[in-house]
């Protein structure tokens, strides 16, 4: 539905680590919003939000209550934000972690706002899962990863795959539909884990550090340990459970042949091992023959002839940074690029022309050049810049990253 009304809704994530995970993008919206709602867990972030905002702030946690169904709370959280949107305000709501991961009122509010003709969007934040990838040290792509919510896992009797990483969220609120977290049903989750992994398989109880004074929790237990009363007490609403792979999935030789991977897929396996070399207790060799050969070439490396470096005036550097961080400027630019650009001093004619398209291709084209072209004073022609308007590619680096991820 086309947006026709003046109010807007932006949902953002504060990340996990207090203040440190708030992105520059979120900060820019915080400084420009008319009304700010938040549902976060630590007072430092709350103080930061209040100090950096210009609009009225409201704590959504006030709608939680031990005697209320959480579903009722989530509807109320959504509705109070929507009321201000309907009144024509630009509303920002900041939620702990990633605002779209295991969060109900955010998706509800965005869906309703859009259905009523308002502009609504979500800005990402660091989730517990992102934090876990860094702290525990594993790549979800190798050999794959499944993410489940604890209660949903049990209700739908989902089978966990022992050949991939398994992440189970909200293990400290199994079967809870209010705000009473007593771990009474935790044993049902342990039953399920024993069925799929056995009692001696090791798992990690994970809680990412929130406050500057906090310490990250990465406690390792066997699944049978999870039945011990003193262990169960350690699981809270911020707990996540990581279950490492128990076995290696068999290779499908028919597909290997179709992909033209030789033998047992050595080329793919080498890449997979390189991705997973930092995983805990992986046992992988960081400097095998292939890795060492790559290292040996470093001292003799020369950039290819088509390698491009940054070539940008101070004006385009400032403007593109402001465009990324200032929502109001971005809105005005998208409505009428030329009128905004006319007010920016210092842009070269090529830079202004490239920016006038409001397309990424011309900007990439004009802000990079080979060292040889720079030394010779060569500039891209206007036709070359215009010809890149249909390109979304940021160049070889991003293309290479995509190929590596999907190989």
Swiss-Prot record:
Region span, Precursor leader: 371-393
UniProt-annotated stretches for the region Clasp domain: 247-370
Modified residues (N-methylthreonine): 399-400
Molecular function terms, GO-annotated: methyltransferase activity
Region described as Methyltransferase domain: 1-246
Family: In the N-terminal section; belongs to the precorrin methyltransferase family.
Keywords per UniProt: Methylation, Methyltransferase, S-adenosyl-L-methionine, Transferase
InterPro entries, per the entry: 4pyrrol_Mease, 4pyrrol_Methylase_sf, 4pyrrole_Mease_sub1
The species this protein was found in: Cerrena unicolor (Canker rot fungus)
Protein name: Methyltransferase/ribosomally synthesized type I borosin cyclic peptide precursor ceuMA2
The organism's taxonomic lineage, starting at the top: Eukaryota, Fungi, Dikarya, Basidiomycota, Agaricomycotina
Modifications made to the protein after synthesis: CeuMA2 automethylates at Thr-399, Thr-400, Ile-401, Val-402, Val-403, Ile-404, Val-405 and His-406 before being processed by a prolyloligopeptidase which likely forms a peptidyl ester upon removal of the follower propeptide, which then undergoes macrocyclization with the N-terminus of the modified core peptide. Peptide backbone alpha-N-methylations change the physicochemical properties of amide bonds to provide structural constraints and other favorable characteristics including biological membrane permeability to peptides.
Modified residue annotations for N-methylisoleucine: 401, 404
Binding positions for S-adenosyl-L-methionine per the UniProt entry: 96, 98, 101, 128, 170, 208, 239-240
GO biological process, one term: methylation
Domain comment in the entry: Within the homodimer, the clasp domain wraps around the adjacent subunit to position the core peptide into the other subunit's active site for iterative intermolecular methylation.
């Amino acid at each position: 539905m086309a947006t026709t009304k003046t109010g807007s809704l932006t949902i953002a994530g504060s990340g996990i680590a207090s203040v440190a995970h708030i992105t520059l993008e979120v900060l820019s919206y915080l400084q420009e919003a008319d009304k700010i709602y938040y549902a976060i867990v630590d007072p430092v972030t709350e103080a930061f939000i209040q100090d950096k905002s210009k609009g009225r702030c409201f704590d959504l946690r006030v709608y939680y209550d031990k005697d209320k169904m959480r579903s009722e709370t989530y509807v109320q959280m959504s509705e109070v934000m929507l009321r201000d949107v309907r009144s024509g305000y630009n509303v920002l709501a900041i939620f702990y972690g990633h605002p779209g991961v295991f969060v109900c009122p955010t998706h509800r509010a965005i869906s309703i706002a859009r259905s009523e003709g308002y502009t609504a969007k979500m800005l990402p934040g660091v989730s517990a899962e992102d934090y876990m990838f860094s702290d525990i040290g594993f790549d979800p792509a190798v050999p794959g990863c499944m993410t489940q919510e604890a209660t949903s896992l049990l209700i739908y009797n989902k089978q966990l795959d022992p050949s991939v990483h398994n992440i189970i969220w909200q293990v400290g609120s199994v079967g809870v539909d209010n705000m009473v977290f007593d771990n009474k049903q935790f044993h049902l989750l342990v039953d399920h884990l024993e069925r799929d992994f056995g009692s001696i398989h090791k798992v990690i109880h994970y809680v990412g550090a929130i406050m500057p004074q906090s310490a990250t929790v990465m406690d390792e237990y066997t699944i049978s340990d999870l039945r011990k009363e003193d262990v169960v007490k350690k699981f809270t609403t911020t707990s996540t459970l990581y279950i490492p792979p128990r076995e290696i999935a068999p290779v499908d030789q028919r597909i290997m042949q179709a992909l033209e991977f030789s033998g047992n897929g050595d080329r793919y396996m080498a890449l997979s091992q390189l991705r997973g070399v930092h995983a805990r207790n992986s046992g992988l060799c960081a400097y095998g023959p292939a890795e060492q050969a790559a290292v040996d070439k470093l001292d003799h490396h020369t950039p290819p002839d088509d390698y491009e470096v940054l070539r940008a005036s101070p004006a385009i550097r400032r403007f593109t940074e402001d465009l990324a961080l200032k929502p109001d400027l971005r809105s005005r630019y998208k409505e009428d690029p030329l009128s905004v650009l006319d007010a920016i001093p210092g842009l070269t004619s090529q830079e202004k022309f490239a920016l006038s398209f409001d397309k990424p291709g011309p900007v990439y084209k004009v802000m990079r050049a080979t060292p040889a072209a720079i030394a010779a004073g060569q500039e891209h022609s206007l036709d070359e810049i215009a010809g890149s308007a249909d390109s979304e590619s940021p160049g070889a680096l991003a293309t290479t990253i995509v190929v590596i991820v999907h190989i």
